Amino acid sequence: AEGYDPRVLSRIRRGASLGDADLQLLQRQRADWQRRITAELQRFDALLMPTVPMIAPTIGELAADDAYFRCNGLMLRNPAIVNFLDGCALSLPCQRPGAAPIGLMLAGLPMCDEALLGWALAIERRLAEA
């Protein structure tokens, strides 16, 4: 536990009470969800969404644990969905000059990295022209 940020460690410790049966059930449920979502998303080339759903807060705004955990969960929401699916994703910077940094996330199904990179290059070119 030494070396972990206390806020990260508290999340890791949440799983300490789970047993083998709990883990197996969660793995089966995740695999079922992955199969269903993959089947639904086959007809799309990519999913487009904000990399994070809000402008990043200042460090001072996250001093209290409750504010940190609320913001952290929100910031990880979109990428976490792709991670849970075992998908692939990337983020393209797309802010206007002088504006706060924002990113456009392109996400794809598992093992579709090459196709997703092709879409990213095309979108990046269009953004550069805008």
Model-derived features with residue positions:
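An anion/phosphate-binding loop that grips the pyrophosphate of nucleotide cofactors and donors
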Residues: 44
